[in-house]
């Protein structure tokens, strides 16, 4: 999927994610509320709205226990992005369930930590993007190049990609997060 929808907090629910998936992109449901029942309803609504693949984002900072992890496993989700925390906390449970896990990283240090944790890929988010930021404010294109020197994992470029020209210049990435 060349365009992967960002899991924007409080916005990226089943309506948006299904529209993206139906249009040929890859929709992702956000779970910032941490409310397992609400997230279950959003995941199940996706099956009414699309027959296309989609993923779920799990912000680690907001996970109080493994209930959300168990939910994505029970609902047979195949792709998860994690963010805002150490992916090592839940990576093995997710991967043991056959789920592909990409972790959002705003820095080289975060990327190296995620690689060591065993993620399947990275969502590389420069300072131009939303979400949790690196205080060093490294731009996307510099960040992509610096991370690519250290790993061959698939990378999704995220942040500030608004047209085809910028899409083209994100050539160090494998896909784009918009």
Please report, for each region that a protein language model flagged, where it lies by residue:
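Active-site entrance/lid segments in N-terminal catalytic domains of soluble metabolic enzymes
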Residues: 1-156
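Short, hydrophobic alpha-helical packing/hinge segments within bilobed ligand-binding/sensory domains
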Residues: 17, 166-167
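Conserved acidic functional residues
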Residues: 104, 159, 175-177
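Glycine-rich adenosine-cofactor-binding loop
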Residues: 157-163, 170
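Single conserved hydrophobic/aromatic residue that forms the stacking wall/gate
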Residues: 168-178
